[in-house]
Design a protein with these regions (language model features):
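Short, solvent-exposed turn/loop segments enriched in Gly/Ser/Thr/Pro and often Arg
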Residues: 1-2, 52-57, 161-167, 173-175, ...
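Active-site segment of extracytoplasmic enzymes that catalyze sulfate/phosphate-ester chemistry
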Residues: 1-13
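Active-site-proximal cap/lid insertion segments
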Residues: 11-21, 36-206, 218-226, 278, ...
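C-terminal cap/loop subdomain of S1 sulfatases and analogous C-terminal strand-loop tails that border
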Residues: 18, 39, 165-171, 197, ...
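Alpha-helical elements of Rossmann-like donor-binding domains used by nucleotide-donor carbohydrate transfer enzymes
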Residues: 26, 30-33, 143, 210, ...
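Residue-level signal for nonpolar/aromatic packing positions in well-ordered secondary structure
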Residues: 31, 77, 85-87, 141, ...
Length: 358
């Protein structure tokens, strides 16, 4: 709330219905109105706008025409699969292979029209709803950018497009974001602005907390000592490919305080030390997952080689596209990644201790 007080103007409303009164269009309208007001200002000061949309987010109540475009129905799925609905993701599973600690979280069992279902029909319908919401947001962003161009300030403005997290919607048998697979940990990140070469891509290796120091450097503002992030301004300008060699992930909600991940190069380790969530005789779940993301970018598991799953995904995984943690051939790699993870946990002051962590 304190940060919000630093803005000269603030408009705050959250609505995930499919109307234009206070949904995505309302958010875009407020920014467009601000640009219109700036046209009349004689002594314009540099501006910063933070625009956060209500969608996409469950319940994914898309607009009727867009739902029809993506073969989806609201709120519940149709009686049979609509051929226009998006196909299931390549790493779809009908259930997660092991209890991972959050049996009652809303994202996993209370999403409107989904609940506990992970059928092909349900997931394809939910993907269609998600696409409908995303396209509506995309349209509203287009309106904002057009208004910025009309204001004459587009060429001198840095634009950051991103999100707070990804989402599963059927991937690995999950629905929400409370996991450390790539589909939920990674986020979209697109930047445009002066001296940023168009249509280029960089590895980056950044955290969202790196955005603040980057904005400070771009604006010529001294980066506060309290900021933990690293500016990736040189990455934006093509002078560097990345600012971090290691990425550390943690999730501590529900019954799973012990879910951590580490990434370096092509290798990624996810480590679970959680309770299974059972209300009678709960048990520990201790699992390692080791992936080579270059060879297995979708983090496919042995369960993805099930004939029933392949019949739905239409994808035949390669033999080595599995969790490699139990393979003796990769014992040394697992140990190196564990050592790196434990080192990073100590560096950031993570109080949790895994079963084999000294």
């Amino acid at each position: 709330e304190g940060a919000n007080l630093l803005f000269d103007e603030r408009y705050d409303k959250t609505n995930r219905e499919n109307n234009d009164l206070d949904g995505n269009k309302w958010h875009a309208d407020k920014v467009i109105e601000y640009f219109e007001k700036r046209k009349t200002e004689l002594n314009k000061k540099p501006f910063m706008v933070f625009l956060g949309f209500s969608h996409p987010h469950d319940p994914r109540r898309g607009k009727k025409k867009l739902l029809e475009k993506y073969g989806a129905s609201n709120p519940d799925p149709p009686k049979k699969i609509n051929s226009k609905s998006p196909v299931v993701p390549i790493n779809y599973l009908p259930s997660h292979p092991f209890p991972y600690g959050d049996p009652d979280i809303r994202d996993e069992n209370s999403v409107e029209g989904v609940y506990l279902s992970r059928s092909e029909l349900t997931i394809r319908n939910e993907k269609g709803k998600d696409f409908a919401c995303i396209e509506d947001m995309d349209f509203q962003i287009g309106r904002v950018l057009e208004a910025l161009k009309e204001s004459g300030e587009y060429e001198n403005t840095y634009i950051f497009f991103t999100s707070d997290h990804g989402i599963a919607i059927g991937k690995h048998g999950l629905m929400g974001k409370q996991n450390l697979y790539e589909h939920s940990w990674k986020i979209p990140f697109v930047v445009s602005g002066p001296e940023i070469k168009k249509n280029t891509e960089a590895k980056g290796n950044i955290y969202l907390l790196d955005v603040l120091p980057t904005l400070c450097e771009i604006a010529g503002i001294t980066i506060p000592e309290t900021v933990d992030g690293i500016s990736f301004n040189k990455v934006l300008r093509g002078k560097k490919n990345k600012v971090r060699n290691v990425l550390y992930g943690a999730y501590s909600g529900g019954f799973k305080p012990g879910m951590r991940s580490i990434k370096k190069g092509n290798w990624k380790l996810i480590k679970y030390d959680v309770m299974d969530g059972a209300f009678t005789m709960p048990r520990k779940v201790q699992v390692n997952q080791l992936f080579n993301l270059n060879k297995n970018p979708n983090e496919l598991l042995i369960e993805h080689q099930n004939e029933g799953v392949i019949a739905i995904t239409k994808n035949m995984p390669k033999k080595n596209q599995i969790n490699l943690a139990e393979n003796p051939k990769y014992k040394s790699r697992l140990q190196k990644m564990e050592k790196l993870l434990f080192s990073e946990m100590e560096k950031v002051g993570d109080p949790f201790k895994f079963w084999n962590q000294k």
